[in-house]
């Protein structure tokens, strides 16, 4: 039974290795292109449709490389605190991606390019800040070693690429004063410059094992860029494409096309691998509106026009790009690569076989670990103890050390494996259990916490209190000054104590003196509503009302129609005429010497001839029964008209 089980396990390992080494269209992961954006890795199929995203927990992704032998993607995060380079693998059972730290951060690295050697399982990367190219194995915790040091010569390594079959490393030197494309053996020997002329700022570079050529991006002067290629020794240099208004970073090559990421347009572009213009160094410059100094021959068309194709629009700035090439299947019979492919396959199969055998032998221990030790704890059968991972404790690793550790903050495990709290604004202490305002403000002061973490909290003091913590009682301080002022009248008392001393003097004037300041009324708030102001205001209002009344009355008198004046003339004589029986003194005109004429304008002013205004007889008759209105009608009896 053991032999049968062992044979089945070996067969399973071989089948698994075969699946890992199948071409792109047969992979269970079903992606063909992977692009790093700023905060994620985006996977796309052959038609550039997004099928998955991963690495969302990272903040500043940049470089990217791919190991087809084990389906591992290696990428860099510029802002991660602990790690510099990470690996990403698809979990077929859980259908998700698992990211693990591969290279720890040792300083302020700035990775420009990444490359992987599947034979020795080494990662190579360029550091644009230190101006060096490093390498380190993906397993273990070995310190990265320097393969190429360009700092002394002022170089700036950018893109890197590994020629797996010929065991060489290629890189671009983007130093604008002396740009180059160079190579070196993977053991650090035989460094060679293969391109050093007619180049401005080379960026990404890739080795095409199918055509045995190099492809790189050159960020030309001005707004131009180009994609060029040459043989692996630098000969047969060709310009595949020259265009403008792009800011390309990295590129990838398939069997028939070139793909590159563009930061300006946030897109991935493609162009056939067929070159458009061949470059030499002995011909006249190309006649076009360009600011670079590259010498070109007359354009020699190599094929039909091949326009650019924008294959993918991205939501963020595009950076690294890798493509699945089916390297291990297509190069099995290549005379340069056959031996390397065979060795890689053997290593993968052997590695998986050892893994399966070890799993079989440790199966019982694994069960014990799962049942006995929680949270990934390691079970020690000899001592029957659990070795807990960082962040857990207890006999079975069941207690999370950060659980309820920080009262007002976030808990993280420190480098020394101790829980550490990062407090919220306004709190402090080892466990963020103390408020920065606790006991700070005295005497009822209100504590204010600024949003700026570097600014200390402040106190807003109530009335009659001051100081940074409201610890100064103005009443007590001023009472001391005012008591001393009682004995030393010339002593200076702060101005703010005046009102306080007045209040204290009302209760205890024997011991309290009120300071008198010259021109104190200038400093005090003026009293507006005094008695004189009120009197003047009232007089002004009354005068204004009287003036308005006079004006209104005058206007009414001016526009009121005049009443007509009634004039009556009466002739009075002493002797009546004898020749007329009907003559009476009131009807006969008197003689010239014996008569007078009375002109009556207003009965109310009958004082001219001392003649009464009313007829006496009628007055006597109607006195008892006439009203005031009837009196007006008897103002002179026998008048020709009724005046009223």
UniProtKB/Swiss-Prot annotation:
PROSITE patterns: EGF_1, EGF_2, EGF_3, LDLRB
Gene Ontology terms describing biological process: canonical Wnt signaling pathway; oogenesis; positive regulation of circadian sleep/wake cycle, sleep; spermatogenesis; triglyceride homeostasis
Disulfide bonds: 402-411, 406-421, 437-447, 441-459, 461-470
Organism expressing this protein natively: Drosophila sechellia
Lineage of the organism: Eukaryota, Metazoa, Ecdysozoa, Arthropoda, Hexapoda
Segments annotated as LDL-receptor class B repeats: 121-166, 167-211, 212-257
Positions on the Extracellular side per record topology: 27-531
PANTHER family: PROTEIN CUEBALL (PTHR46513:SF42), VITELLOGENIN RECEPTOR-LIKE PROTEIN-RELATED-RELATED (PTHR46513)
Sequence similarity: Belongs to the cueball family.
Keyword Cell membrane: yes
InterPro entries from the UniProt entry: 6-blade_b-propeller_TolB-like, Cueball_EGF_LRP_Nidogen, EGF-like_Ca-bd_dom, EGF-like_dom, LDLR_classB_rpt
Acidic residues composition bias: residue spans: 286-301
GO cellular component, one term: plasma membrane
Residues passing through the membrane, by range: 532-552
Residues annotated as glycosylated: 82, 108, 175, 190, 313, 473, 508
Name listed for the protein in its UniProt record: Protein cueball
Record's signal peptide: 1-26
Subcellular location: Cell membrane
Task performed by this protein: Has a role in spermatogenesis and oogenesis.
Membrane topology: Single-pass type I membrane protein
């Amino acid at each position: 039974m053991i032999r049968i089980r062992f044979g089945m396990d070996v067969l399973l390992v071989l089948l698994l290795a075969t699946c890992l080494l199948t071409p792109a269209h047969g992979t269970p992961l079903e992606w063909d292109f992977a692009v790093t954006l700023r905060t994620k890795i985006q996977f796309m199929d052959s038609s550039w449709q997004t099928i998955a995203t991963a690495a969302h927990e990272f903040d500043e992704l940049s470089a990217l490389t791919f190991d087809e032998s084990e389906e591992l993607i290696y990428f860099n995060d510029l802002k991660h605190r602990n790690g510099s380079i990470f690996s990403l693998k698809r979990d077929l059972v859980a259908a998700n991606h698992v990211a693990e730290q591969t290279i720890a951060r040792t300083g302020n690295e700035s990775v420009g390019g990444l490359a992987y050697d599947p034979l020795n399982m080494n990662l190579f990367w360029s550091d644009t800040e230190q101006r060096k190219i490093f390498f380190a194995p993906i397993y273990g915790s070995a310190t990265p070693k320097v393969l190429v040091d360009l700092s002394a010569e002022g170089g700036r390594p950018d893109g890197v690429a590994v020629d797996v079959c010929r065991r060489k490393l290629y890189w671009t030197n983007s130093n604008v004063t002396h740009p180059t494309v160079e190579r070196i053996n993977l053991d650090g020997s035989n460094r060679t410059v293969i391109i050093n002329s007619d180049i401005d700022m080379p960026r990404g570079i890739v080795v095409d094992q199918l055509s045995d050529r190099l492809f790189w991006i050159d960020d030309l002067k001005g707004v131009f860029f180009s994609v060029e290629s040459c043989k692996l020794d630098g000969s047969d240099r060709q310009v595949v494409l020259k265009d403008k208004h792009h800011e390309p970073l990295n590129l990838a090559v398939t069997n028939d096309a070139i793909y590159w990421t563009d930061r300006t347009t946030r897109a991935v572009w493609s162009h056939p691998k067929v070159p458009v213009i061949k470059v030499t160094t002995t011909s006249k410059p190309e006649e076009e509106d360009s600011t670079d100094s590259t010498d070109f021959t007359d354009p020699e068309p190599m094929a039909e026009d091949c326009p650019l194709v924008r294959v993918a629009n991205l939501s963020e700035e595009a950076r690294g790009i890798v493509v699945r090439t089916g390297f291990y299947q297509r190069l099995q019979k290549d005379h340069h690569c056959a031996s390397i492919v065979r060795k890689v396959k053997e290593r993968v199969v052997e590695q998986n076989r050892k893994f399966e055998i070890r799993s079989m032998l440790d199966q019982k221990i694994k069960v014990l670990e799962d049942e006995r030790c929680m949270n990934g704890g390691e079970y020690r059968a000899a001592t029957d103890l659990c070795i807990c991972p960082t962040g857990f404790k207890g006999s079975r690793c069941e207690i999370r050390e950060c659980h309820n550790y920080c009262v007002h903050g976030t808990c993280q495990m420190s480098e020394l494996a101790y829980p550490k709290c990062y407090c919220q604004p306004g709190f402090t202490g080892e466990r963020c259990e103390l408020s920065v305002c606790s006991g700070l403000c005295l005497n009822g002061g209100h504590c204010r916490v600024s949003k700026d973490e570097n600014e200390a909290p402040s106190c807003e003091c109530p009335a009659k209190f001051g100081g940074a913590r409201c610890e100064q009682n103005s009443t007590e301080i001023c009472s001391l000054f005012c008591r001393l002022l009682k004995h030393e009248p010339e002593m200076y008392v702060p101005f703010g104590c005046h009102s306080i001393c007045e209040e204290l003097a009302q209760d205890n004037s024997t011991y309290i003196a009120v300071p008198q300041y010259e021109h104190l009324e200038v400093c005090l708030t003026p009293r507006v509503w005094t008695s004189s102001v009120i009197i003047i205001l009232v007089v002004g209002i009354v005068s204004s009302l009287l003036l308005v009344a006079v004006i209104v009355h005058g206007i009414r008198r001016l526009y009121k129609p005049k009443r007509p004046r009634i004039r009556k003339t009466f002739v009075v004589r002493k002797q009546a005429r004898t020749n007329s029986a009907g003559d009476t003194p009131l009807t006969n005109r008197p003689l010239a010497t014996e008569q007078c004429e009375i002109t009556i304008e207003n009965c109310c002013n009958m004082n001219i001839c001392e003649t009464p205004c009313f007829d006496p007889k009628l007055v006597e008759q109607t006195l008892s029964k006439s009203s005031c209105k009837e009196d007006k009608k008897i103002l002179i009896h026998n008048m020709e008209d009724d005046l009223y």
